[in-house]
Amino acid sequence: MRLTVFLSLFLGVMVFGAFDQEAFLFVQHLTSENFESALNMCSNQVKAQLSVQSLSNIWNSLKAQLSDFREIAGYEKIIQAEYEIYNFTLKFDRGEISALVTMDREGKVAGLFFKQATKTEYELPDYVDPESFEEKDITVNGLPGKITIPKGSGPFPAVVLVHGSGPNDMDETIGPNKIFKDIAYGLSSKGIIVLRYHKRTFVEKVDPTTLTVEKEVIEDALEAVKILKERKDVSRVYVLGHSLGAMLTPEIAERSKADGVVMIAPPARPLEEVMEDQLKYLQSLGLASNVEETLNILEKLKRKEIPPDEFVLGAPAKYFYDLRERDPASIAKRLTIPMLLIFGGRDYQVTEKDQEIWLKELSGRENVKILVFDDLNHLMISGEGKSTPVEYMKKGHVDKRVIDEIARWMVK
């Protein structure tokens, strides 16, 4: 089975229209196989035609064709007379399918239909100049990757991109958004070599009971830094991490002797504490279920009351204990290399609590820069109002200000 660590951090969701939230919750119930809750959201007419068992049969037939479900990869809304139709793209191990959910005026599910998904093409952000760099295939410890190289004689500064939690591809695709592709193309348009690669848990069938942070993230990141250091067209090497990847970049930089670190939305607290705050936030918006049960598990993890090999919240308990021992702020404090930290003011996953820890440990140092963009969310995409996981289903791009700040900082 593929490992999907339970990190709402890393759950994804959008500021809703009329029934966006209800439609998304219905699909969440369906994809998490909570068929009774899904049926309860349906209109009386639909309930007369469907049962819990029939919903289960429909879902299992999809899995039989497409293997394990992975994520909700995006959606669009269509208004049709008195109905709102939501087209959700569902990603499985062996392909994608569209789930069309029809909502009536009362916010009840009035229809459900599945069809083959149509693939959407990646659109270049305005800040990308595709003529200014070239992209080549590369492998990192056997993992497929890409390296984008500016045109010209060089040498150039270079950076390795380290993913957030879960089985991410090289583009760090979240819904319809490709965070690392935006960053790679944006930075290479400004004279920086960028190396990105598929995360090991994206490529391999991993036994989650044997998973470690070292094997999942750090080993491959160290190899990626080594690859860049051996290139003649590279002047210096940076490590850039997002979310959980940002949490680990100080250790990766220290062990690889990198020349600098960029941390985008880096947690500073233990994972259980970050998840607890996320869960309570989502509960306040009506977007979380089984809250008390999950909070109880998180509390036990904090006290290390769960046996290390016991599987909880998508990972063995020892995975959480391992992360807890890696204190990123303390490691960063002893580093002497330049560091750039970027936060989104609308980020509900990595919050002011984390910012305050980083500020306490690193403020006052001339080679450390900390930026907060008030309108950006966890993905560094701009928006308004409260951020939710469904926001991540809306197509956008990493904000130009983030790209510009990173490029200026690396090139100077």
From Swiss-Prot:
Cleavable signal peptide: 1-20
Top-rank lineage group of the source organism: Bacteria
Gene Ontology MF terms in the entry: carboxylesterase activity; carboxylic ester hydrolase activity
Enzyme class: hydrolase
Disulfide bonds: none
UniProt entry tagged with the keyword Hydrolase: yes
Effect of residue 378 to N: Loss of enzymatic activity
Thermal dependence: Optimum temperature is around 95 degrees Celsius. Shows >70% of its maximal activity in the pH range of 5-9. Displays a relatively high thermostability with a half-life of 1 hour at 100 degrees Celsius.
Activity regulation info: Is strongly inhibited by phenylmethylsulfonyl fluoride, a serine protease inhibitor, and by mercury chloride. Diethyl pyrocarbonate, a histidine modifier, also inhibits the reaction, albeit less pronounced than phenylmethylsulfonyl fluoride. EDTA and dithiothreitol have no effect on enzyme activity.
Keyword Cell membrane listed: no
Active-site annotation: 243 (nucleophile), 347 (charge relay system), 378 (charge relay system)
Role played: Exhibits significant esterase activity with a preference for short acyl chain esters (C4-C8) in vitro. Its physiological function is not known. Displays neither proteolytic activity using casein as substrate, nor peptidase activity when assayed with L-leucine p-nitroanilide and L-proline p-nitroanilide.
Family: Belongs to the AB hydrolase superfamily. Esterase 10 family.
Quaternary context: Exists mainly as a monomer and, to some extent as a dimer.
Protein name per the record: Esterase EstD
Gene (name only): estD
